[in-house]
Amino acid sequence: MNFRQFFKLILLFCITVSSCQSTKNELYVLSAPAGNLYTKINRTGTTVLPNGRFLTPAGKSYEVAPHPFGLVLSGDGEIAVTANSGISPLSISIIRNLSSKPEIRQVPPGPSGNAGVLESVFMGLAISPDNKKVYVAAGQDNSILTFDLLTGNKSDSIDCAVSADGERFPDGYIGDMVLSKDGTHLFAVDQMNFRMLIIDTKKMQVIKSVQVGRYPFGIALSHDEKKVYVANVGMFQYSKIGRIEQTSDYKKALSFPAFGYNTEAMRNGIVTDSMVIPGLGDPNSDKAFSVWAISIEDCDNPKVIARIKTGNLVGQMVDGIPAVGGSSPNSLVATTDWLFASNGSNDNISVIDLKTDSIVKDISLKPDESVKHFRGVIPFGLAVSPDEKKLFVAEAGINAIGVIDIPAFKVLGHIPTGWFPSKLKITPDGRNIVVTNAKGYGSGPNGGKDFKEG
C-alpha cells in the first residue's frame, strides 16, 4: 500500500466545540493512548499513528498529494487549492464544487510530477477575484506561476529575481502570499532574501520589495488594505565567511562552531589572524521572532512602520525555566480591530491592536491543565469567522483545531483533525472549515516487492 495515498485534505462540514474540563492539581502519568497497538489506518474509524496517538478526524476527507502546507479558498467558497510540497509529486490540487460533489484535479498529474510544469512549490497561493486563475509560489524557482482553474494549464509566470526599479535578487525562495481584494496587487515573502515583494498583477511584474526581518514566513493584509503584516520566524542571520564560495576553497571552511550560543562573539562575530567570521545577530533583536507592519498606502513607496516582538524572549523565564528558543510567529490573520499571530514555539497566540500595532494579550493554547508546563501544541494556520467572533487555530502538534472566542480572548475547545493540520479557511457562510492536514492519516506498512507506484 502506498503511504502517499493517505495524505488528506479534511473538509469539515459540521463544527462542534467542546469546553475544556478543568482538573485538580495532582500527579499525572502520561502515556501514548495506543499502548502496544500497531500502526493502523482506518478511514472510517480510529487511526493509530506511529507515535502512538489516535486520529478521529471530524468532517469528510478528500485525498490530495503529500504535504499540503498551503491552502486558499475562493471568495464564493466553491474552489479550494492546496500547495503540496516536501516530497514528490510537487504539485497543487484544485478542488472544485466544495459545497456539493467535490472534483479534484492534481497539477501536474501523476505520482512523479512534471518539472517542466511545476519544478518547485511552497505554501503561497492566491485566487483571482473572478475565480479564473490561481497564483502559486514556486519556492526555490524564485518565481510566481499562474494556472487556469478550469483546465489546470499553466498560463503565465512572474520573475521575482528582478523588479521594475532595477533591483536584482537572482537567488530567492518565494513562500506565503496574499492578494488585494481587487486583485491588482500581490504581496509575497522571499524567505531567502528577507524581503516582502509587491507585484502588479496587470504587468505581472515585481514593482517594489521591502527588507523585513529574519526569515519572513507568514503574511496578511489589514482589512482596509493600508498595511501588510509579515511574520518573521528566524532567529539568526547567517553570512558567508570570506570568499570561500567564490574560490571553491572549502578547506578554509570551519568544521567546528566558531562561538558559543548566545555569547557576545556569537552576536557580533569574531576576527582572527586568518579570517573574519560574521556574527549571527541578537536573537532578541526586533528582526528576529517578530511581526513587521508595512504601510502600502502608496505601493510605489512602501514603508516599514512597526516592528512587533511576539511571544517569549530568548532567555526569558517561563514557568521557572529560561526560554531557549524564540516564539516563531509563523501565520497571521486580521479582523477589523485585531491581528492574530500564531507563535509556533510558545504554544500561544499574540493579539495585536491594529490601531497601535502593539500586543495587548497572549492567548495560551493548553489543551489540559495537567500538561501546562509542556510544549508541543504548535499553532500554525489561522482563520477568522465572517462575523469576526471566532478565531480558529491549526494545532499541528495535537492534531486539532483550537476555537477561540475573540471578544473574550478565551479558548472554547478543540476539534479533532487529521495528522498535522497546517492551514485552514472558513467558508463565506461561516458554517464550514476547510483544513489541510500535512501528514494526512499517516503511513501504513510498506507496499512490498510487488508494489507499483501510482
Spans of model-derived segments:
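Blade/loop signatures of beta-propeller domains
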Residues: 25-57
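Short loop/turn segments that connect beta-strands within beta-propeller blades
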Residues: 96-100, 149-152, 200-204, 296-300, ...
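Short, conserved, GDST-rich strand-edge loop motifs in beta-rich repeat architectures
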Residues: 28-40, 83-85, 231-288, 438-454
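Residue-level detector of Asp-centered blade-edge/turn motifs that repeat once per structural unit
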Residues: 75-76, 129-131, 181-182, 223-225, ...
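Short loop/turn segments immediately following the C-termini of beta-strands
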Residues: 85-86, 139, 191, 233-235, ...
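Surface-exposed loop and turn segments in beta-propeller and other repeat-based domains
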Residues: 48, 60, 105-117, 156-169, ...
